[in-house]
Amino acid sequence: MHINTPVLLAIIYFLVFAPKSADAWWLLSKTDTSSANSGSSPILCKNVPGLTPQQKRMCHENPNIIKYLISGLRSALHTCEYTFQREAWNCTLTLPGVGTSPLQIASRESAYVYAISAAGVSHSLARACSKGLIDDCGCGETPQGSGSVAVSQASSRSSSDFVWAGCSDNVKFGNTFGRKFVDQYDRQHATEPRSQMNLHNNRVGRRLLVNAMNKECKCHGVSGSCVTKTCWKVMPKFDEFASRLHQKYQLAKLVTNNDQKLTVRSSPSAGSSGRSERFARNMDASSKQMRNELIYLDASPNYCAIDVKDRECGENCPNICCGRGWRTTREIVDEPCHCQFVWCCEVKCKTCKKLVERNYCL
């Protein structure tokens, strides 16, 4: 299935919405970053309407950091579209024929987009830091007090012995800079229910990224032996993280505004169990139990009102096509086959023809 570019999605979105909003910074996703580096300081944000003075200042003072922030935003939108490609809402930012967008509605879809965008920015900045691409940051912090120490004699050590070393992804920097930039508008309107929702979901995205970090290790020794093992912390691939966040989307909690405080309502969430709903009933959205849960204020729009004609629906046609039926086509495609490893270091493949079936909504 062809995936539309996230840049195009963002452009379409901002043709629909007034940029004077919490979403104005998304306009950066269509900004040309090719000349942004530590040696030159083009004002990447000068033509982006709706940014706060603080965002404009950060953009002017940190062009190289903003370049990777933009890259993270683009990655988030692209990954969102890929994750939802087989669902009724495929992460499109406009609803043809409806005259609105999911992001104008404080829905579970909006909750996911905010969370994935905040995490995408942090992911991109954290990885750029660990690669030495940003002068203002370096490797992430090394965990302390692990109690696992490598020993000199391989025969007397267990496979779990290691020392923290190497270069961890700097998620702390990514989250800190991302929060200061992305959350700027909503922090200034923190008494408004929609801004409270946005800030909560941004925090969830960043917190889940930290929680998803894994230990990666490398052995050191003669002839492949593991006399010493060093380990560091790395983030998961972003598409893997997006899949985990999708589970949170399915279990997102409906909240209501109660005297400028968001409270979880006892309304069923997609894929949730009655037990989990009873547990969350009448719970403050800022409570400890809700720290890792997405929240939303409004029901989702009717995605069956969208013109889905000719949309590829895969194995989920009854849901995506909304009962309008679908057609199946058979196509011959080229794909690599009979691949062989050629020393050193190349993989050579032949090209084979394959008959595939594709389903499209009527």
UniProtKB/Swiss-Prot annotation:
Ligand for members of the frizzled family of seven transmembrane receptors. Required in embryonic development for endoderm specification and the correct positioning and orientation of the mitotic spindles and division planes in blastomere cells. Involved in cleavage axis determination. Binds to receptor tyrosine kinase cam-1. Together with wnt ligand lin-44, plays a role in controlling vulva precursor cell P7.p lineage orientation during vulva development, probably by acting as a ligand for tyrosine kinase receptor lin-18. Disruption phenotype: Embryonic lethal with severely defective embryonic morphogenesis with the formation of unspecified differentiated tissues, no endoderm and excess mesoderm. In addition, embryos have defective mitotic spindle orientation in the 8-cell stage ABar blastomere. It comes from Caenorhabditis elegans. Glycans are attached at residue 90. This is Protein mom-2. Residues 1-24 form the signal peptide. It holds the Pfam family wnt. It is found in: Secreted, Extracellular space, Extracellular matrix. Residues 263-282 are annotated as: Disordered. GO terms for biological process: asymmetric protein localization involved in cell fate determination; canonical Wnt signaling pathway; cell fate commitment; embryonic digestive tract morphogenesis; embryonic morphogenesis; endodermal cell fate specification; establishment of cell polarity; establishment of mitotic spindle orientation. Its main location: secreted. The gene is mom-2. Keywords: Developmental protein, Disulfide bond, Extracellular matrix, Glycoprotein, Lipoprotein, Secreted, Signal, Wnt signaling pathway. InterPro entries: Wnt (IPR005817), Wnt_C (IPR043158), Wnt_CS (IPR018161).
